């Protein structure tokens, strides 16, 4: 791995400047330093530096080990065929560790995995080999659009959080936001079966209270996401459960339902997987 990756892989100031040079020039130094502490920049870079010889799936596995995070996997039906092409879809309760666990587990069973992620995560360069960036807040760059399409046309297994953002407190329960139908459309187009999964876990009460307050105040920017690195480090030594349901053949996604209706049906299957393990 090159020296640039080993020295510093997350730089808040660089990220802000890359997204909005004008904002970067206006932000006082103490605000940037506060954000660095808030997202645990030094701790994240220490993790990456300690594992400088690893990237992709191996790095995700090493980070879980260093954080003493473990997980148990439960199947409710037949396991995915190692020779198949799949889109693995899951709820998104945590915003960090859930993705790491999916990369580590699915990557240990298939030789090639790709994760559809917010393009901001591409600044974590050692994990870039498994990431496929999408811009959730604006227009996608042409090269990223091409990579997105090429990934679905490839033989790589695809990991996908259809909600995009991590779960929020909805009607008193931690639940995903609305799932987007894109994965259904792409499954049909690329002839991939879909594997519904459910991931246990939730963030702190403060995270959900801040999200609720932000919404009440009419603030559109998801400021609570700045807390996600802290939520990750708070879960050192934790154990989680991953429930994997029966693969859904893309050929079964017929015109009987719209793509959005199929999306909602598969979401229900994902949440039901936790109650159907053998």
Residue ranges and their predicted role:
Residues 67-74, 140-142, 224-226:
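Short gly/ser/thr-rich secondary-structure transition/capping motifs
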Residues 74-76, 116-118, 134-135, 245-247:
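Conserved beta-strand termini and adjacent loop/short-helix elements that scaffold enzyme active sites
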Residues 57, 142-145:
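Structural motif corresponding to alpha-helix initiation and N-cap regions
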Residues 1-89, 99-101, 110, 128:
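Membrane-anchoring hydrophobic helices of lipid-metabolizing enzymes
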Residues 63-69, 134-140, 172-173:
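Short, flexible loop segments at the rims of nucleotide/cofactor-binding pockets, characterized by
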Residues 2, 12, 145-278:
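Non-catalytic C-terminal accessory region of glycerolipid acyltransferases
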Residues 41-43, 86-140:
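Catalytic core of membrane glycerolipid acyltransferases/transacylases, capturing the structured
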Residues 61-65, 124-125, 233-236:
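Short, conserved catalytic or adaptor-binding loops enriched in Gly and charged residues
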